[in-house]
Regions:
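Glycan-recognition surfaces
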Residues: 1-54, 75-83
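C-terminal beta-strand-rich structural cap/linker in extracellular carbohydrate-active enzymes
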Residues: 158-197, 218-220, 229-245
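Aromatic- and carboxylate-lined catalytic core of secreted/periplasmic carbohydrate-active enzymes
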Residues: 33-40, 45-46, 50-79, 169-188
Length: 245
Protein backbone atom coordinates (compact mmCIF):
# COMPACT_ATOMS: atom_id res chain seq x y z
CA UNK A 1 0.00 0.00 0.00
CA UNK A 2 3.01 2.29 0.41
CA UNK A 3 3.45 2.26 -3.36
CA UNK A 4 -0.10 3.51 -3.88
CA UNK A 5 0.45 6.28 -1.31
CA UNK A 6 3.75 7.25 -2.91
CA UNK A 7 2.00 7.48 -6.27
CA UNK A 8 -0.49 9.96 -4.85
CA UNK A 9 2.45 12.28 -4.18
CA UNK A 10 4.87 11.47 -6.99
CA UNK A 11 2.49 10.25 -9.69
CA UNK A 12 1.70 13.80 -10.74
CA UNK A 13 4.92 13.83 -12.73
CA UNK A 14 6.20 10.24 -13.07
CA UNK A 15 4.86 6.72 -13.51
CA UNK A 16 5.43 4.58 -10.41
CA UNK A 17 7.34 1.37 -9.89
CA UNK A 18 5.64 -1.13 -7.57
CA UNK A 19 8.73 -3.37 -7.47
CA UNK A 20 8.92 -7.07 -8.33
CA UNK A 21 6.61 -9.92 -7.39
CA UNK A 22 6.55 -13.71 -7.49
CA UNK A 23 3.84 -15.09 -9.75
CA UNK A 24 4.09 -18.40 -7.87
CA UNK A 25 3.41 -16.83 -4.46
CA UNK A 26 0.49 -18.87 -3.12
CA UNK A 27 -0.56 -16.17 -0.64
CA UNK A 28 -0.53 -13.00 -2.71
CA UNK A 29 0.62 -13.85 -6.24
CA UNK A 30 -2.72 -13.02 -7.87
CA UNK A 31 -3.23 -10.00 -5.61
CA UNK A 32 0.17 -8.60 -6.55
CA UNK A 33 -0.40 -9.25 -10.25
CA UNK A 34 -3.57 -7.17 -10.23
CA UNK A 35 -1.82 -4.39 -8.32
CA UNK A 36 0.85 -4.28 -11.05
CA UNK A 37 -1.85 -4.00 -13.70
CA UNK A 38 -3.61 -1.03 -12.13
CA UNK A 39 -0.35 0.68 -11.13
CA UNK A 40 0.61 1.42 -14.72
CA UNK A 41 4.24 0.77 -13.84
CA UNK A 42 6.69 -1.84 -15.14
CA UNK A 43 6.16 -5.52 -14.37
CA UNK A 44 9.03 -7.83 -13.56
CA UNK A 45 9.03 -11.28 -11.98
CA UNK A 46 11.40 -12.64 -9.36
CA UNK A 47 10.51 -16.31 -9.44
CA UNK A 48 12.56 -18.72 -11.54
CA UNK A 49 11.10 -19.21 -15.05
CA UNK A 50 10.27 -22.82 -14.23
CA UNK A 51 8.02 -21.55 -11.43
CA UNK A 52 6.10 -18.98 -13.48
CA UNK A 53 2.32 -19.18 -13.05
CA UNK A 54 0.88 -18.16 -16.41
CA UNK A 55 -2.58 -17.53 -14.92
CA UNK A 56 -1.06 -14.58 -13.03
CA UNK A 57 1.05 -13.29 -15.93
CA UNK A 58 -0.97 -13.54 -19.15
CA UNK A 59 -3.85 -11.34 -17.87
CA UNK A 60 -1.31 -8.47 -17.77
CA UNK A 61 -0.23 -8.57 -21.42
CA UNK A 62 -1.20 -9.05 -25.05
CA UNK A 63 0.13 -11.74 -27.40
CA UNK A 64 3.39 -9.83 -27.94
CA UNK A 65 3.99 -9.28 -24.24
CA UNK A 66 2.94 -5.63 -24.28
CA UNK A 67 1.40 -4.44 -21.01
CA UNK A 68 -2.16 -3.19 -20.84
CA UNK A 69 -1.91 0.03 -18.84
CA UNK A 70 -4.34 2.51 -17.28
CA UNK A 71 -4.51 6.10 -18.49
CA UNK A 72 -2.99 7.27 -15.18
CA UNK A 73 -1.44 5.38 -12.25
CA UNK A 74 -3.71 4.08 -9.50
CA UNK A 75 -3.99 6.04 -6.26
CA UNK A 76 -5.90 5.48 -3.00
CA UNK A 77 -9.53 6.53 -2.86
CA UNK A 78 -10.09 9.56 -0.57
CA UNK A 79 -11.12 7.59 2.53
CA UNK A 80 -8.04 5.36 2.22
CA UNK A 81 -5.39 8.07 1.92
CA UNK A 82 -4.69 8.66 5.62
CA UNK A 83 -5.29 5.15 6.94
CA UNK A 84 -2.98 2.25 7.72
CA UNK A 85 -4.81 -0.63 5.98
CA UNK A 86 -2.95 -3.21 8.05
CA UNK A 87 -4.66 -2.03 11.24
CA UNK A 88 -7.60 0.14 10.19
CA UNK A 89 -10.20 -2.61 10.34
CA UNK A 90 -11.56 -1.29 7.05
CA UNK A 91 -11.33 -2.04 3.35
CA UNK A 92 -8.57 -0.29 1.42
CA UNK A 93 -9.58 0.99 -2.02
CA UNK A 94 -7.57 2.24 -4.99
CA UNK A 95 -8.61 3.33 -8.48
CA UNK A 96 -7.25 4.30 -11.88
CA UNK A 97 -8.82 5.53 -15.13
CA UNK A 98 -8.85 2.83 -17.79
CA UNK A 99 -10.03 2.79 -21.40
CA UNK A 100 -13.32 3.97 -22.92
CA UNK A 101 -14.10 6.29 -20.03
CA UNK A 102 -14.06 3.46 -17.49
CA UNK A 103 -12.56 3.52 -14.01
CA UNK A 104 -10.92 0.40 -12.58
CA UNK A 105 -11.11 -0.10 -8.83
CA UNK A 106 -9.59 -2.67 -6.47
CA UNK A 107 -10.87 -3.25 -2.93
CA UNK A 108 -8.48 -4.92 -0.47
CA UNK A 109 -8.65 -6.50 2.95
CA UNK A 110 -5.05 -6.11 4.15
CA UNK A 111 -5.82 -6.22 7.87
CA UNK A 112 -3.51 -8.38 9.97
CA UNK A 113 -5.70 -8.56 13.08
CA UNK A 114 -7.89 -11.69 13.45
CA UNK A 115 -10.68 -9.33 14.57
CA UNK A 116 -10.86 -7.99 11.03
CA UNK A 117 -10.73 -11.24 9.13
CA UNK A 118 -13.90 -10.05 7.43
CA UNK A 119 -14.51 -6.44 6.43
CA UNK A 120 -17.24 -4.75 4.45
CA UNK A 121 -16.51 -2.76 1.31
CA UNK A 122 -18.82 -0.46 -0.59
CA UNK A 123 -18.71 0.99 -4.08
CA UNK A 124 -20.86 4.04 -4.74
CA UNK A 125 -21.96 5.60 -7.98
CA UNK A 126 -20.34 8.83 -6.86
CA UNK A 127 -16.97 7.03 -6.87
CA UNK A 128 -17.06 7.17 -10.65
CA UNK A 129 -17.21 10.96 -10.59
CA UNK A 130 -13.68 10.90 -9.14
CA UNK A 131 -12.48 10.03 -12.62
CA UNK A 132 -12.56 13.79 -13.13
CA UNK A 133 -9.52 13.89 -10.85
CA UNK A 134 -7.56 12.08 -13.55
CA UNK A 135 -9.08 13.55 -16.70
CA UNK A 136 -11.07 16.76 -17.10
CA UNK A 137 -14.71 16.51 -18.14
CA UNK A 138 -14.69 12.71 -18.32
CA UNK A 139 -17.68 12.07 -16.05
CA UNK A 140 -20.80 13.84 -14.86
CA UNK A 141 -23.17 13.18 -11.98
CA UNK A 142 -25.88 12.31 -14.53
CA UNK A 143 -23.77 9.60 -16.17
CA UNK A 144 -25.19 6.09 -15.88
CA UNK A 145 -22.60 3.61 -14.64
CA UNK A 146 -22.24 -0.15 -14.99
CA UNK A 147 -20.51 -2.05 -12.17
CA UNK A 148 -18.63 -5.09 -13.47
CA UNK A 149 -17.18 -7.69 -11.10
CA UNK A 150 -14.12 -9.08 -12.89
CA UNK A 151 -13.96 -12.32 -10.89
CA UNK A 152 -17.64 -13.30 -11.02
CA UNK A 153 -18.15 -11.78 -14.50
CA UNK A 154 -21.41 -10.22 -13.33
CA UNK A 155 -22.66 -6.77 -14.27
CA UNK A 156 -25.32 -4.45 -12.91
CA UNK A 157 -26.20 -0.81 -13.23
CA UNK A 158 -24.87 1.06 -10.22
CA UNK A 159 -27.82 3.27 -9.36
CA UNK A 160 -26.66 4.02 -5.80
CA UNK A 161 -24.17 1.66 -4.14
CA UNK A 162 -23.09 -1.97 -3.89
CA UNK A 163 -21.87 -3.60 -0.67
CA UNK A 164 -19.90 -6.83 -0.31
CA UNK A 165 -17.61 -8.69 2.10
CA UNK A 166 -13.86 -9.20 1.87
CA UNK A 167 -12.91 -12.33 3.80
CA UNK A 168 -9.27 -12.87 4.70
CA UNK A 169 -6.22 -11.38 2.99
CA UNK A 170 -7.77 -10.74 -0.40
CA UNK A 171 -8.81 -8.28 -3.09
CA UNK A 172 -11.64 -7.78 -5.57
CA UNK A 173 -11.33 -6.13 -8.97
CA UNK A 174 -14.13 -4.03 -10.49
CA UNK A 175 -14.67 -1.89 -13.56
CA UNK A 176 -17.00 1.11 -13.50
CA UNK A 177 -18.06 1.61 -17.12
CA UNK A 178 -20.21 4.45 -18.46
CA UNK A 179 -23.48 3.45 -20.13
CA UNK A 180 -23.88 5.57 -23.24
CA UNK A 181 -26.68 5.21 -25.80
CA UNK A 182 -27.48 1.78 -24.40
CA UNK A 183 -23.89 0.47 -24.58
CA UNK A 184 -21.22 -0.17 -21.95
CA UNK A 185 -17.90 -1.48 -23.23
CA UNK A 186 -16.20 -3.68 -20.63
CA UNK A 187 -13.47 -5.22 -22.77
CA UNK A 188 -11.69 -8.57 -22.95
CA UNK A 189 -12.54 -10.57 -19.83
CA UNK A 190 -9.28 -12.51 -19.65
CA UNK A 191 -7.22 -9.36 -19.02
CA UNK A 192 -7.16 -7.55 -15.66
CA UNK A 193 -7.53 -4.13 -17.30
CA UNK A 194 -10.41 -5.20 -19.54
CA UNK A 195 -11.41 -1.64 -20.58
CA UNK A 196 -7.87 -1.00 -21.82
CA UNK A 197 -8.08 -3.89 -24.30
CA UNK A 198 -10.50 -2.12 -26.67
CA UNK A 199 -10.82 1.21 -28.42
CA UNK A 200 -14.20 2.67 -29.34
CA UNK A 201 -14.20 3.86 -32.95
CA UNK A 202 -17.85 4.90 -33.23
CA UNK A 203 -21.05 4.54 -31.23
CA UNK A 204 -24.69 5.15 -32.16
CA UNK A 205 -28.02 4.04 -30.72
CA UNK A 206 -27.92 0.78 -32.68
CA UNK A 207 -24.32 0.24 -33.77
CA UNK A 208 -20.95 -0.03 -32.03
CA UNK A 209 -17.58 -0.25 -33.77
CA UNK A 210 -14.56 -1.33 -31.75
CA UNK A 211 -10.88 -2.03 -32.24
CA UNK A 212 -10.16 -5.10 -30.11
CA UNK A 213 -6.48 -5.28 -29.20
CA UNK A 214 -6.14 -8.92 -28.11
CA UNK A 215 -7.79 -12.32 -28.26
CA UNK A 216 -10.25 -13.56 -25.67
CA UNK A 217 -13.87 -13.02 -24.67
CA UNK A 218 -15.15 -9.52 -25.35
CA UNK A 219 -17.81 -8.36 -22.87
CA UNK A 220 -20.31 -5.69 -23.90
CA UNK A 221 -23.42 -4.50 -22.03
CA UNK A 222 -26.32 -3.88 -24.39
CA UNK A 223 -29.70 -2.27 -23.74
CA UNK A 224 -32.41 -2.58 -26.38
CA UNK A 225 -36.22 -2.34 -26.28
CA UNK A 226 -36.29 -2.39 -22.48
CA UNK A 227 -34.05 -5.49 -22.26
CA UNK A 228 -30.52 -5.71 -20.87
CA UNK A 229 -27.88 -8.17 -22.04
CA UNK A 230 -24.28 -8.87 -21.09
CA UNK A 231 -23.04 -10.16 -24.43
CA UNK A 232 -19.94 -12.36 -24.78
CA UNK A 233 -18.14 -12.30 -28.13
CA UNK A 234 -15.24 -14.63 -28.94
CA UNK A 235 -12.24 -12.82 -30.45
CA UNK A 236 -9.71 -15.14 -32.12
CA UNK A 237 -7.46 -12.40 -33.50
CA UNK A 238 -7.00 -8.68 -32.76
CA UNK A 239 -9.35 -6.86 -35.12
CA UNK A 240 -11.93 -4.16 -35.72
CA UNK A 241 -15.48 -5.39 -35.23
CA UNK A 242 -19.01 -4.01 -35.59
CA UNK A 243 -21.74 -4.96 -33.12
CA UNK A 244 -25.43 -4.44 -33.80
CA UNK A 245 -28.15 -4.43 -31.15
Amino acid sequence: FQSYTNTLLLGQTVWPDHDMFHSCDTVCGTLMARSKAISGGPVYLSDAPRDFIKENIFPLIDEQGKLFRPEAPAVPMPESILTNPLWSGKAYRVAAPSGNGAMTLICYNLNVSPRHQQVQAIIKKEDYSLRNSFEKMSATSEERVLLYNWESQKAEELSDSSTFELIGFTDKLFHLCPIRKGWAVIGVQEKYLSPSTVQTISLTENRLELNVLCTGTLKVWIENSGKQELRSISIDTPQKIVIEK
